[in-house]
Amino acid sequence: MDVELVYKGKDKEVLANIPSISLSEVKRFGSSLLDEWHNMLIFGDNLPVMKTLMSRSDIKGQVRLVYIDPPFSTNQEFRVGVSRTSTVSSSREDQTAYQDLLVGSEYLEFLRKRLILLKELLADDGSIYVHIDWKMGHYVKVLMDEIFGQEHFINDITRIKCNPKNFKRKGYGNIKDMILFYSKTDNFVWNGSYMSYTKQQLERLFPKVDKDGRRYTTTPLHAPGETKNGPTGQPWRGILPPKGRHWRYPPEVLEQLDKQGLIEWSKTGNPRKKIYADEYVKKKIYRQDIWEFKDPQYPSYPTEKNLKMLKVIVEASSNKEDLVLDCFAGSGTTLIAAEQLGRRWIGIDNSPKAIEVTLKRLLALKKVRPFILYNGSGEPLPKTLQEVL
């Protein structure tokens, strides 16, 4: 289905109208051979910066994974205090981390242009995750259908971001945002994503405890559908399966299960099979499209995202040495995840504070591969950023 979002100010010749910009090397971190790949942290407006990156054959069409957490069109300033980080601060004494002041069609066009460039940078087997909120997400979904094709829409992931808030409003409380997952083509990298149960989940799913202290639950020994002529439709120990159902196992298997102590008999003589938690958890649990990765309690940057969540995305949609791009790098969580999982990376942001925080986080890692800080702003590096180098 062909879709298009129509709004005022929509540019029909995006690629032709975006200027490129020179990237000047500011500082190298770590040492390696000159002709080896260096990860890139770039200060500047991501639009002309990405246009410049398109001129490099080792980047254009080579990015395996894009994750972006763009501004949400909140019409607010996000600030950082000296002793704390605030998601939204009204104090003029705090340093501005970034401004999220674009709204309406202006915001949509801002994001659309960047999505078009990101598609150009993506490899044919690459994919993109766009993290957005519930207010703008549905408009962005239509934009992405237009750019990437509705046939390449993979998932709308719900992310539980916080605990329920106890305040009154005319409507339901909001504890989630969304991640739109698209591929560039049908042939995209997918390694699957699996999860393990928490202790609380196991206690809820396996509420019973046997004499040896093992947690278990029970399930019916019969299944839907009658089997009148087969062995699973016959009486076992004088008991017929309920009407319209059959035994899950033939009588000889039921006898074996009972000898092994894997059948629990109720006071009324109803048999049920025991399922033990310690055996069940050995199975891989396929991750679904509702995630609970809450924001860090003490973020180093406003809107900082959960590192475990980014690792899930990086592991599922890229392989070692693949190139990962985040053009709204923020606190650098995508880059940290890529670095720790052995991927190459490019991070771009126009906030001096974002670059500062990302640098500190990267250099705090026990091991970090060589990377280069570039200035792609077209202006001298801000003094606040010069002071931390």
Predicted features by range, described:
Residues 328-332:
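Class I SAM-dependent methyltransferase "Motif I" SAM/SAH-binding loop
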Residues 2-323, 355:
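Class I S-adenosyl-L-methionine
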Residues 353-389:
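PRPP-dependent phosphoribosyltransferase catalytic core
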Residues 333-343:
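Conserved SAM-binding loop of SAM-dependent methyltransferases across substrates and taxa
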Residues 57, 148, 342, 362, ...:
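Active-site catalytic pocket residues across diverse enzymes, especially alpha/beta-hydrolases
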Residues 345-349:
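Conserved SAM-binding motif I beta-strand of class I
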